[in-house]
A protein has these predicted regions:
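N-terminal export leaders
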Residues: 1-5
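Short acidic, glycine/serine/threonine-rich helix-capping segments at coil-helix boundaries
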Residues: 192-264
Length: 265
């Protein structure tokens, strides 16, 4: 599981920043998994009340509520929260979600305790990041720009730790939360860009537009010329090298630069 912004070797040469703090350690290029969700009973999962230092709150009723996920998935959530706190300077004391495990037949990673639907991050009773696109998408243009910048900052951090990150761009059912799961690379896998992943490509396109101001990029889900040109230029200008498709190192460098750009805007 990734924990901090240390440096790790990648199979095939080069180095990848695989964590937020911690020693250098080798990692391999995690292969994609062909696994499917396995339905688990809630009794097989541990009861949890927080993600890192942030208590878990059920978004529907605003009450502190336990959630249930597998141990490895919980560790990745905690690592992401460390990344978020370190790179943004925010100190969320509450994370609102629609829950982790849900009972089902194994058609969703929620059924195996390897997914969470994140709605808001809050500090002292106030939002520091709202992923409730459904609530603010019709606000003033200036307010929507501000919220989109923060939204995609959070999404960038999630993409550092999870390969499957579904936003309002995926479909309307995700307009009130960001969904994360560990299905593509399995628990503890190191995410990287999969060029055929429409969700990943749309995310980097939205980051280009809403964080970097690259308005010539379209959120098409296709890794087209304008997207490649914009992301390569961002990498070049902010300490990275190569292209996003080069592997873990470039992927992480782009995402970390995006988080910092949103923070400093």
């Amino acid at each position: 599981v990734l924990g901090g912004l240390g440096v790790a070797a990648v199979a095939g040469g080069g180095w990848a920043l695989a964590s937020v703090v911690g020693p250098e350690r080798p990692v391999t290029m995690t292969p994609e998994s062909s696994a499917h969700p396995a339905a688990l009973d809630r009794s097989a999962l541990r009861r949890r009340t927080a993600i890192g230092d942030a208590r878990h709150v059920y978004e529907v009723d605003g009450r502190a509520t336990p959630y249930y996920v597998q141990d490895a998935f919980a560790a990745t959530l905690a690592a992401w929260m460390t990344t978020h706190r370190t790179l943004t300077g925010q100190r969320p004391d509450a994370l609102h979600s629609y829950g982790g495990w849900t009972q089902g037949a194994g058609t969703s990673w929620h059924h195996s305790g390897q997914a969470l639907d994140i709605a808001r991050l809050r500090t002292g009773g106030a939002d520091v990041a709202s992923l409730r696109y459904d609530r603010w998408r019709d606000d003033t243009a200036a307010e929507v720009r501000r919220r989109l910048r923060t939204y995609w900052q959070v999404a960038a951090g999630l993409h550092l730790h999870f390969a499957d990150v579904l936003t309002y761009l995926f479909d309307a059912s995700h307009s009130n939360h960001i969904h994360v799961d560990s299905g593509r690379f399995g628990p503890g896998g190191v995410p990287r860009l999969i060029p055929r992943s429409g969700a990943q490509v749309q995310a980097i396109q939205a980051m280009c537009v809403h964080v970097w101001g690259r308005t010539g990029v379209q959120t098409s889900g296709e890794l087209d010329g304008p997207t490649r040109d914009a992301t390569t230029a961002i990498l070049r200008d902010h300490g990275g090298t190569g292209e996003l498709t080069d592997g873990v190192e470039a992927w992480q460098a782009f995402l970390r630069a995006t988080i910092r750009q949103a923070r400093d805007a």
